[in-house]
UniProtKB/Swiss-Prot annotation:
Key word Cytoplasm present: no
Summary of the function given for this chain in its UniProt record: May play a role in DNA repair. It seems to be involved in an RecBC-independent recombinational process of DNA repair. It may act with RecF and RecO.
Zn-finger segments (C4-type): 56-71
Organism the protein comes from: Sphingopyxis alaskensis (strain DSM 13593 / LMG 18877 / RB2256)
Transmembrane segments: none
Pfam families (alphabetical): RecR_C, RecR_HhH, RecR_ZnF, Toprim_4
Protein name (Swiss-Prot/TrEMBL): Recombination protein RecR
């Protein structure tokens, strides 16, 4: 039997995505065995991020600075904008290092079942960014789900009439698949094979 404090830590870790009770228990045991080399640095990193965490007012990414590191990077191609549903999608795509541009996070996807409407997402901010000019291409990188494709179709309608080339990730992506669960090779192929919308 373990103390209530250790059990509380296991329960907190088990609440994280991808960690069940067994994995959380193993993680806690590892942290306790490697107390000096693992526990203290993890605690310090969590504390630092917790204190400095902000949402980028330009793109919606989560970082410790505003604007985020991607928006502030002058080497990024500001003429190319990739629209994603969630921050996890941005991180998955950016990890592939194949998209040289900047991003825009919607904060979800349209869903009649879940009651998510256009005004619940960062769509107006996207239209404002495009209307401001300087963007040549908008890549709609929605998940290959019914809601994702509905969102992409809605965005294509909202951006119609602006002088931008609309492209969409190729659908070698599995239907029903989510970007943050895909391997880098699949994401790379989808980015390379993007095609015009409509």
């Amino acid at each position: 039997m373990v103390s209530t404090e250790i059990e509380a830590l296991v329960q907190q870790l088990a609440r994280l995505p991808g960690l069940g009770p067994r994995s959380a228990r193993r993680a806690v045991l590892h942290l306790m065995k490697k107390r000096e080399s693992a526990f203290a640095p993890l605690l310090a990193a969590l504390q630092t991020v917790s204190e400095r965490l902000v949402t980028c007012t330009t793109c919606g990414n989560i970082d410790t600075h505003d604007p985020c590191a991607i928006c502030a990077d002058p080497r990024r191609d500001a003429r190319s904008l990739c629209v994603v549903e969630e921050v996890s999608d941005l991180w998955a795509l950016d990890k592939s290092r194949l998209f040289p541009g900047k991003y825009h996070v919607l904060g979800g996807r349209l869903s009649a079942l879940e009651g998510v409407r256009p005004q619940d997402l960062s769509i107006d901010a996207l239209v404002t960014r495009v209307a401001a000019g300087g963007i040549d291409e908008v890549v709609l990188a929605m998940n290959a789900t019914l809601e994702g494709q509905t969102t992409a179709h809605y965005l294509a309608e909202r951006l119609e009439g602006y002088p931008v080339r609309l492209t969409q990730l190729a659908h070698g992506l599995p239907v029903g698949g989510e970007l943050d669960y895909l391997d880098e090779g699949t994401l790379a192929q989808a980015l390379r094979a993007r095609r015009p919308v409509g």
